[in-house]
């Protein structure tokens, strides 16, 4: 797939959102590249971030790799997305390619993770339904 840019939603200030294009790092030998198909929007936490009413003294979520750090602008946020594995690192089973997965990731078009951070979805499971797994 070569060099990949990801388009990510950033909350930049209260009631301000923008789409930023950023290059992804090189795929590691133990990683997979996922193309996002859909992501769910939280009417709770994400609305607080959008409105600027989030707790600035708390971490976003240290258990989700894409959300490490504090609540401060600019902030890429979101934590429920479904995608398809498009590339596998050299140490990853190639049979994972084209498999549908759930991931705790911000709203972004592409991301890189290790397979152990993904939930493989059964064949025929709709992406829209899978977004509500958490």
Task: Give residue ranges: language-model regions.
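A glycine-rich, Thr/Ser-enriched phosphate-binding loop motif common to dinucleotide/cofactor-binding enzymes
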Residues: 95, 104, 123-134
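Residue-level marker of beta-strand positions
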Residues: 38, 99-101, 110
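Short N-terminal strand-loop motif that marks the start
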Residues: 1-74
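Generic structural detector for well-ordered beta-strands
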Residues: 21-23, 112, 120
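A structural motif shared across PLP-dependent enzymes of the aminotransferase-like
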Residues: 104-115
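A glycine-/small-residue-rich N-terminal strand-loop-strand element
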Residues: 75-104
